[in-house]
Structures are given as structure tokens and as C-alpha cells.
Amino acid sequence: MLCETFLFHGYLILVFLSGSVAQFVSNESIKLHDILKPSDTHRLFDTLQYSVQEQYSDSHLSFDVSTIYNYSEKPISIGKLNRKYRDILYEGDMAISYKQLSLIVNGSTEYRKAAKPRLKDKKNLRNKRQAYLDQNYPATIWKNGVPFMFHESLSPSAKAAILKAIHFWYRETCIEFRPRTFQKEYLLFIGNDEGCWSTVGRDASQGKQVVSIGDGCEHFGVTSHELAHALGIFHEQSRYDRDESVTFNPRVVEKDLLFNFAKISPRQMSTYGLPYDVGSVMHYTPTEFSNFPSIPTLTTIDKNLQQTMGQLEGPSFIDVHIVNQHYQCQEKCATLAPCQNGGFTNSRNCKICKCPTGFGGVYCQLIAPSFSKFCGGVLNAEETPRRFDITIRQSTSVRSKSCIYHIKAPDGKKVIVEILKIDSKCIEGCYQDGLELKMKSDFRPVGYRFCCPESSRRRIMSESNLVPFIVYSKEENFSVSFEYSFVSSSARFDDGNIVEDVVIENPDGVFVSDSESSLLQKLGFRKSL
């Protein structure tokens, strides 16, 4: 009897390729056109296209030159790998059933019309619901675990990448996975068709749900992305609140592809109150569906986040958090751990926390460990700028190297970082080698990532007195130099300069606010630069 072995959850699994003990390997021939018909989707795609055109009818071809980078190479693009099926896949890689797509189209158009007169009340709209679910939830999640099968056409590298993704989502959530025996509802991973695509969520009406990992898709970032779809997760830029974080440039997208940029309404999507994450593995690349190789379709409103967009390294902390929320993993713990710095309780060990990147310890109260004892730790900021230089070389058998630091300033102060020089390979998402600075007070989303030389001479101010940062190298040598210091919490940027408004209060009732006032200097007040 023929058999094959796979490493699964740390164990070596023996899979029989013939016999009736298990049905782990399939030889059934199946392709995307066996699941979806263009005639079923075109009318609905046309409706979404019209909706996007109408919503962005006042948009002009507008982009900041600073968002165009001289990339050393183009990273993996799921959209390009799926070019053959552009007319049938939703948002480039989702095999949405006619029923699902109809709900999305109806919800999207109704929400857009209803939201127009309520733009002033965006905050209330945003806080009502936020994560990935529809009115059929929780029937759309795999509550009893995820049975899965491999098609015989899958290459060894594809199988390894799929199993790595399965093990990741098993380890990071409460979801159970198991090779299929005789279950009627299961995931079937195939390699005999082109592209990387998946169905979305559990759909009992389909029985087997297909996930394609074709040639070029055999990477953990891709397989974890497609498996997230199968677990019920949509793309990050589909969020109905995306316009608060990114700007869409419809003029650089072909008219018949605009439907890929429709937003999904709260009726089909919820984000569980978690922040928008440009660094999500579920986010488009900046140039996705662009007619021009270097002109982005999506630009971040915070320009320092532009290089963070489009990573395919693997799921971010927010991605993991959303899946845990979606599958109600916290409910498995009688008592939640007292997590700090945005961490949440690990449902597989309720006494410890899962931590945002840069943090470690049982409760995320510590700095995460670095790969080497020769780097990492605390840097204490002073008013006078201090210089920091680091180089990570790829000269040993260890490929993935990360050095993690925390810059600390006194309470009531902000940290200033000025990047002097970056020497690195420039790619979208900066997920191979780079610098990540967490300048926001919310440490959960991926921070400002930089890997392109154009990032030099950039000055950034934090929102709090703590800045975690990660210097990482996975492919090539990486080096960065920057200066760091602190200013008062009242400091702000004005035409690129740091200005501190000082208010003097005195018994005569005179109030002065003038950062350039010579009077303040005479009185001994000092302006930090």
C-alpha cells in the first residue's frame, strides 16, 4: 500500500494513498470553472463597478510623489498569479458563491446610499460592529474543526506551505484542523489549476470547499492568506471604514476591474473594534490592479505607513486577533489573563497572553527577545539627539534575524526619530529586511516599515513616550542609522519643523502662546528642536 508522510502539529502523519481508512488524498479533477460560472458573477460585478464609480466620481488622478518607490524587485503578487481568472474571482482571489456575492452587492450598495447623509456621524457608524461576519454567523465558521484533504496534483513544496499555514492558524487560535475521513464538509486543497484562490468561510451548501495553491503560490504568506479566507476572513481594504486610512485612486485602474475596490458593508463584515491594519497579510499591495507599475492604486493617509502595505510574510497580530474574535476563542477561558500593551489571552493556555510585535513576557509587559544577545534592549531618549547604528549581516545558517528595542522617554514626553540612512533591498511591504517603528500609542497594528533608500532624512514624532522598534533581516544584509531624542507632549510639526507652544499663566491674567517669542527665551523657557 502506498503512503506518504507529512509533518502536522509537530507530529509525523502517515497518509495512506489507497484503501478506505482515510480519504486524505483526492484524485478528483476540479478547476475554478467547475465551481463558478462567469455568467453568474458578471452582472453582480457590473453593479459593484457602477457603485465604485459613483462613490469616487469626484476623484482625480492624485498621488503624492513620495509614495512612488524605486523597488529593487516586485514581490509575490496574488493578483498577478490569478490574472487568468480576473473576470470571475472577487477581489482577485476569492471564489464567492452567487448567493454570497448577491448579499455583498446588496449590502454594499444599500450601505453606501444610507451612509451618505450620515457622514458626520462616522464615529458612531464605525463603532457599531467591526469584524468579518454576516447574518448567517456563526453558521459560517468551522465550529467543529476543519477537515481537510490534499489533491494528488499538489507539489511537495505546496503541501509543506499549506501545512505550515494550518499549523500556524492552529497554534495562534482555538481552531482545530484534522485530515478528513468521512466528513461531508471539508477543505480540498488543489494544485491542478492556475493561481491562488479560495472560498470564504464555511458554506454547508457546498460540501467540499476548494482552495487552490497552484504554481507560484507555494509560500507561507500566500497559503496563510488563502486559508484565512477559508476561515471566513475578507481583505482588509474591503473594510467600510478604509477611507479613513487609505486613499483609493480609481483613475489608474481599468474600468471593468473597479469592482475589486468595493467596500463591504457592516451587514457582511465586522472588525470587532480592531484598528485598520495596513500591514495585514490580507491587505492589497499598493499597486494592485494598477495600469502603471509604479503608480499606486492605494496610498496611506499617514505617509509613513506606505511601505508597510502589501506584505506577504504572514499574518499580522491584528489578523490573528480578528480570527480569535471571529471564532470566539476567548470564551474557552474561564478567566482572562491581565494582558498589557494590547495583548489578549491565549485560548490554548489561558494563563498567558498573545502579544503585539515587539512585546513579550507572560502578560506582554516585557521587550520581546531578540535573535542574538548582542542586540536588543532599552534606549533612553534625551533632549539632545543620540545616534543609533545597526547592521545585520546574513552570514550564518540563521536566516530570520530580528533585534527588538524600546526607546523610552520620560512621562509626558514624545520621541523624535530622524532616519539618516537605510541600506536595504526595496520591496513592497518591506517584509524581507527592514526597520519597523511603532510610533502610535496603539501598539497592535504593524508600525511604520522602512526598507527603501528614499526613506532617508525622514523625521517622525511618536504619540507616546514609548517607541518599540524592530530591525529585521530575512534575505540580505540590512543597515540603518537614525537619531532619537524627546520633546514635550505639546510638540507638533509645522512645515517639517518641531514646534512647542508654551503657555505662561500669571496672576495678571496674561496668557502667551508663542513658540518663537523672545520673551519666553528671556524668561528662561527653552524650545526643543
Can you describe what each PLM-predicted range is?
Residues 3-5, 334-529:
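Domain-level representation of secreted and single-pass membrane ectodomains enriched
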Residues 5, 12, 34-36, 152-154, ...:
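Residues that form ligand- and interface-recognition hot spots within folded domains
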Residues 187-189, 307, 447-450:
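Trp- and acidic/polar-enriched beta-sheet ligand-binding modules for extracellular glycan
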